[in-house]
Structure formats: structure tokens, C-alpha cells
Amino acid sequence: VEAVEMLVRLRLRPGIGRVANAALHVLGVDFPASVRVGPGLALPHGAVGLVVHEDTVIGANVKIYQGVTIGRSDTHLTGARADGGRVVVEDDVVIGAGAVVLFRSGSTTTIGRGAVVGANAVVLRSVPPGEIWAGNPARPTRRSEPSS
């Protein structure tokens, strides 16, 4: 588990970055070097099957489980119509196994600070800070309890 987190950090270093990216791909992890990541990223269970869009921003102390997809909902668009947009994952967020977090071109989907996205949830719009969302499509279920 810690090895995958180390590879994610190493992917930005000259020289070793190519080796780290190749190792991530062998492990089934697509985590482009362009993804901005804050400190304390946790990828439990080796993050097998993790796919992260190249324009994603991930805050501090975020936990992302295996099989998560963060990307565009309108992948059929090309050219100028597909420009812009991203997912922003703020600090202290947990994204459960198999969850899908999507944005539309030209827009931003934000997972607010301290929010929890349940396992296998499909998030199609921004999640306010401190809320727990689950289901397909994902909807708020309750407020998360602040960690002590």
C-alpha cells in the first residue's frame, strides 16, 4: 500500500518518474504527473484500478480507495467542446471503493472539505463540505462527523 503512495510521489521526479509511472500502470493505476496532490494522500489496498483525470486537484489528507474513477462524464466530446473542467477534491475527503466522480467539460465538480463519498457512488455534481454522499446517482445521506 505504501509502495503505491510512494510511486505517486516519485512520478514527478526527473528520470525516476518514468519508472514510477510504468510501475503504476503495471499495478492498474492511472495517475498522471499533471495531477496536483497535497500532503498525506492515502491509497489503501494499493489503489488497484484507480483512474484519475489529468486536471484533477487533490487536497491534503485525502483517502482514495481502490477502483475509483475521477474523470469526465462527456468523453464523447472532442476539440474545443471538450476543453476545461476538472474535479477538485478538498482536504480531509474520503472516496470509497469503486466510486466514480465526474465533471462535465467546462465545469468543476468539487468534493468539499471533510466530505465522504460512499463505495460505488456515482457523483455527478459538487458535494458540499462535511456531507456523506452515496448511491447512483449520489445524493446526500447525512453530515459526516468531524474527526478528533
Language model feature labels by segment:
Residues 76-83:
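Extended, positively charged loop/linker patches that create polyanion-binding surfaces
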Residues 1-29, 130, 136-148:
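Terminal amphipathic alpha-helical/low-complexity segments used for targeting or macromolecular assembly
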Residues 27, 33, 38-39, 44-45, ...:
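Left-handed beta-helix
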Residues 49:
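Short hydrophobic/aromatic beta-strand element in the GNAT-like acyltransferase core
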Residues 22-24, 34, 80:
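Short solvent-exposed loop/turn micro-motifs enriched in small/polar/acidic residues
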